[in-house]
Amino acid sequence: MIRNKAFVVRLYPNAAQTELINRTLGSARFVYNHFLARRIAAYKESGKGLTYGQTSSELTLLKQAEETSWLSEVDKFALQNSLKNLETAYKNFFRTVKQSGKKVGFPRFRKKRTGESYRTQFTNNNIQIGEGRLKLPKLGWVKTKGQQDIQGKILNVTVRRIHEGHYEASVLCEVEIPYLPAAPKFAAGVDVGIKDFAIVTDGVRFKHEQNPKYYRSTLKRLRKAQQTLSRRKKGSARYGKAKTKLARIHKRIVNKRQDFLHKLTTSLVREYEIIGTEHLKPDNMRKNRRLALSISDAGWGEFIRQLEYKAAWYGRLVSKVSPYFPSSQLCHDCGFKNPEVKNLAVRTWTCPNCGETHDRDENAALNIRREALVAAGISDTLNAHGGYVRPASAGNGLRSENHATLVV
């Protein structure tokens, strides 16, 4: 199966290349802001905005003008893609205006900041991979680390400034992704949480994945770095050093979290054919002020994103259970619904109908697994002990409608 895959490599540009990267970032930002202002002004004057084709023609004239001739000194693809990004921002805004759901705001002017990027296209072999280096338009050969992992047909490269002195390139390639062999286990239910990041069950056994809490464990260092930055004079050399140190700590947290999530999602995809998860809405869940930091630290949204694209790559199936499905409240053995379990403080409970004692998270994982199988058209009549149970009756039992969404 042909898929697009991004390979991230660290760049080590020399002084001249660093200056050119920064100039390219600034030029791309200038083009975006200039034509955003032009489109706004044109709409106010005539009631009609400018099209992408019109702005592209104006960009050519802008590069030829004496006062902005410096635009022709940087990568032309970076400027053209900046126009495309502006066009995409407009389309996303107008699309969500007409549709219900989460809204996208009107395009905003871009500020000079640390985490900027530009995208360049592959054409006529202008991007090449060498031993310990990467050739990019205008920059030439740049020293790299990690380029040996790049494979497939190169489509484009995004050059990103993480913080001062730290640059990365994301190389998007078209690669052949082979299907994995049949998984050793059939289906899993995954219940995510805060104390344990995930409880995974195959219907009989449970595996608790501990939550590493990378942000909370680094909070002391972060606060110290933030205090140091607040005491520095903005624009000074010491301010720049303090800002870079703070950015490095944040980057390390992100890298550790990504590594943990990649290892967990890869192991799930390799081990199970069907994976049932909750259809989480982290943005809504973060409205709870007491849990917001812990939810953000866990990275549930990124976990689901990785799980879905890896399942699609390798021929597995992800079944997302509705957020309204009461996975924690239902007794997995008899289907009785206990509303008292809505209280998050209840970690274990005994079913008043059948007398079975449940661990809150393990019971939820079992119910999610069962619902995932129902969505896949497979009935599950095994309880946690491997014994057969009859389908739940109406009333307090499991409802008959499907609560899951399949992602293939």
Swiss-Prot record:
- What does UniProt report about how this protein is used? Has been shown to cleave dsDNA in a targeted manner in human (HEK293T) cells, suggesting it could be used for genome editing.
Instruction: State the deletion phenotype.
Output: When tested in an R1 strain with only a single IS200 element (DR_1651 and DR_1652), not required for transposition of this IS element. Single tnpA or double tnpA-tnpB deletion leads to loss of transposition.
Residues reported in the UniProt entry to bind Zn(2+):
331, 334, 351, 354
User: Any keyword Manganese?
Assistant: no
Extract one GO BP annotation from the record.
DNA recombination
Q: Which GO terms describe its molecular function?
A: DNA binding; endonuclease activity; metal ion binding; RNA binding
Q: What is its EC number?
A: 3.1.21.-
Membrane-crossing residues?
none
The record's active-site residues are 191, 278, 361
UniProt keyword terms in alphabetical order = DNA recombination, DNA-binding, Endonuclease, Hydrolase, Metal-binding, Nuclease, RNA-binding, Stress response, Transposition, Zinc
**InterPro entries assigned:** ARFGAP/RecO, Cas12f1-like_TNB, RNA-guided_DNA_endo/Transpos, RNA-guided_endonuclease_TnpB, Transposase, Transposase_put_HTH
Q: Does the keyword Hydrolase apply?
A: yes
Family affiliation: In the N-terminal section; belongs to the transposase 2 family. In the C-terminal section; belongs to the transposase 35 family.
Quote the subunit structure annotation: Monomer.
Additional remarks: Belongs to the IS200/IS605 insertion sequence (IS) element family, formerly called IS8301. This element is subject to strain polymorphism; in the ATCC 13939 / R1 strain genome sequenced by White there are 7 complete and 1 incomplete IS200/IS605 elements. Another R1 strain has only 1 copy of this element. Another group found 2 copies of this element in untreated R1 strains. This class of protein is thought to probably be the ancestor of Cas9 and Cas12 CRISPR endonucleases.
Query: What function is annotated for this protein?
Result: An RNA-guided dsDNA endonuclease. When guided by an RNA derived from the right-end element of its insertion sequence element (IS), cleaves DNA downstream of the 5'-TTGAT-3' transposon-associated motif (TAM). Cleaves supercoiled and linear DNA in a staggered manner 15-21 bases from the TAM yielding 5'-overhangs. Binds reRNA, an approximately 150 nucleotide base sRNA derived from the 3' end of its own gene, the right end (RE) of the insertion sequence (IS) and sequence downstream of the IS.
Q: Tell me the protein's name.
A: RNA-guided DNA endonuclease TnpB
What is the protein's species of origin?
Answer: Deinococcus radiodurans (strain ATCC 13939 / DSM 20539 / JCM 16871 / CCUG 27074 / LMG 4051 / NBRC 15346 / NCIMB 9279 / VKM B-1422 / R1)
Gene symbol here is tnpB
